[in-house]
Amino acid sequence: MSQAGSSPLYAAIDLGSNSFHMLVVRHIDGSVQTMAKIKRKVRLAAGLDEHNSLSMEAMQRGWDCLSLFAERLQDIPTQNIRIVGTATLRTATNVDVFLEKANQILGQPIEVISGEEEAATIYKGVAHTSGGSGRRLVVDIGGASTELIIGEGFEAKALTSLKMGCVTWLENFFKDRQLNARNFEAAIEGAKQTIKPILEQYTDLGWDVCVGASGTVQALQEIMLAQGMDEVITHSKLKRLQKQAMLADHLEELDIEGLTLERALVFPSGLSILIAIFELLEIDAMTLAGGALREGLVYEMVDELRQNDIRARTICSVQSRYQLDCQYGEQVATLAGKLLEQAGGDEWIAEPQGKVLLETTAKLHEIGLTIDFKKGGEHSAYLLQNLDLPGYTRAQKFFIGEIARRYREQLSSLPEQHAISGTSAKRVLRLLRLAVLLTHRRNPSLEPQVELLAEGDKLTLSIDAKWLEANPLTAAELEIESNRQTDIGWPLTITAC
């Protein structure tokens, strides 16, 4: 790795109870670009005996993993590296033995952080990478601990680290490897008893949204998407997956569509903990966070990345990296927002996220032109669906890409997506296409006076007659657009006024 002065590298290493993770990023254009992610299943927690002494075999697995990580740290400045140990290293009575050799291997100090500090860092990672407003409940199920955090913006209001995790619950409740109702019920009840001491505090504080920041939640989302469900986790979906798991008599026979072999061993135990959290805290829905502990460590090192609006930071970073016309993007977004208000605002596009995604796509829709004009929409879709966009979920990235794919010329119906309702989705697309057509001169002072009337899906766009006479090319393109939308069942009438 070369160390460019203008784009410094940072590394964050998390010595977890189930896996060791390493994240290497580059700080560029006001954001972070992931350069490497390395994960090794070490299952450190499984090496603890009844006296909380870590076995030599478990320590050796950890040292072997760190030998691999050490190679990637050689070219990164010491001040840009954070290495932390979590629940198992907090618990192990012989942790000094492990740390002495681990420090030698890495050539860097390892911090064994408290449960509260771990929870605070997880929250920072979530706050810096996940969009949305209001108070959020963050759930992170690790190998030997589970962190529950309530916060708003970048401020955590309640931090708790509970002594339960997918590895320890595996050993405590699924030791016989049987996936029967008795084991699941015991695991769920055990988790509830662990959570109960903090229940009143958390329910009194309350929250608006819930996000999951762990491998368990990521595995659940991958399973749901593989099975044709949307990405939002609900209690009914968790119970459905429990039933699927119980179709296998033993853990070694577990075969659920979308579940990787790597995650299978600790899946039932992690699922049990999450079911208990949903039931006890009465959670309606959960989405996957954009980051957690490792991302929190990175953002602690890079002070200038602290910005309240994560999505605004992401948009600004992408515009800078791809040299987009920011003023024009703002012009399209402003007009699209104006058209939305004329059409009925949140009565016409019900979901608040609809307006956010319309604005985002308006500001980034031309990104594909940096590759080629001819297939600009196709390139925009590919980039927006595959770039790391902190603040946006996988479903939202897919939706933004599909809207950008269709921002001009030929029009086709949208594919199935799970970001917003189908009705709102097509309305976002219609508004963006009109805003792009009406701003083609790229100067707000040259825009026409317009009025958009919506009666359900029937749109009537009234435009100043003199402007239409003075801009015959745009007038012709608007007539073509009227035909395109009407032909696929989205009636659009253009009138002069």
From Swiss-Prot:
A Pfam family that this protein carries is Ppx-GppA
**Pathway linked to the protein:** Purine metabolism; ppGpp biosynthesis; ppGpp from GTP: step 2/2
The UniProt keyword set, sorted, is: Hydrolase
**Which reactions appear under catalytic activity for this entry?**
guanosine 3'-diphosphate 5'-triphosphate + H2O = guanosine 3',5'-bis(diphosphate) + phosphate + H(+)
Provide the GO biological process annotations: guanosine pentaphosphate catabolic process; guanosine tetraphosphate biosynthetic process; nucleobase-containing small molecule interconversion
**What EC number(s) would the UniProt record show?**
3.6.1.40
Belongs to which family? Belongs to the GppA/Ppx family. GppA subfamily.
In terms of NCBIfam families, this protein maps to: PRK11031.1 (NF008260)
Q: What does this protein do?
A: Catalyzes the conversion of pppGpp to ppGpp. Guanosine pentaphosphate (pppGpp) is a cytoplasmic signaling molecule which together with ppGpp controls the 'stringent response', an adaptive process that allows bacteria to respond to amino acid starvation, resulting in the coordinated regulation of numerous cellular activities.
Spell out the PANTHER family in the cross-references: EXOPOLYPHOSPHATASE, RETROGRADE REGULATION PROTEIN 2
Entry protein name: Guanosine-5'-triphosphate,3'-diphosphate pyrophosphatase
Q: Which organism is it from?
A: Vibrio parahaemolyticus serotype O3:K6 (strain RIMD 2210633)
Source taxonomy lineage?
A: Bacteria, Pseudomonadati, Pseudomonadota, Gammaproteobacteria, Vibrionales
Q: Which gene encodes it?
A: gppA
